[in-house]
């Protein structure tokens, strides 16, 4: 009986620590991220085909983002419901619904990580926190890995895996947070037919 009790403690105790550490990491990220209302900087993107794109990004909570590509003729603007592809003059080329998209959830006013995501793991290393998760109530099996700066809780990197396991990676640098970003930056124009 004594050996059974010791074995049970050794088996269950590490899991208890792991859950407690995960909850602490999630809490730190959530608190810090919810304090950030705007964020801008530069990004580099590697798509599922291995192509590298660079540019500037802008986040304005709730739900608005813009990715201005340095070496493409198109940019991306998002709001709560749509991802829009626009030309360099701001005219819409195409749009897609983003109902359960990770970016939409991240850019909400008050992110509740455990409500919005199914956590696979949350780890802490010397410089950052990393979470791998799926989107709760999503109709796809897409996954996301999010990396946050440990000191500033700035989003440094995301890796998105779609249902076919294609991966898109964005890394964020030269980050500024809680600065003024005009609503006009996210205006999409439409051509008259």
Which role fits each region the language model picked out?
Residues 114-193:
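Gly/Pro-enriched, hydrophobic low-complexity segments
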Residues 7-14:
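Bacterial N-terminal signal peptides
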Residues 39-43, 53-57, 65-67:
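One face of beta-strands
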Residues 15-20:
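Sec/Tat signal peptide C-region and signal peptidase I cleavage site
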Residues 57-105, 168:
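An acidic-aromatic
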Residues 31-50:
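A short, Trp-centered hydrophobic/proline-enriched beta-strand micro-motif
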Residues 45, 69-70, 88, 159-162:
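Beta-turn initiation residues at beta-strand->coil junctions
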Residues 1-4:
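Positively charged n-region of N-terminal signal peptides that target proteins for export
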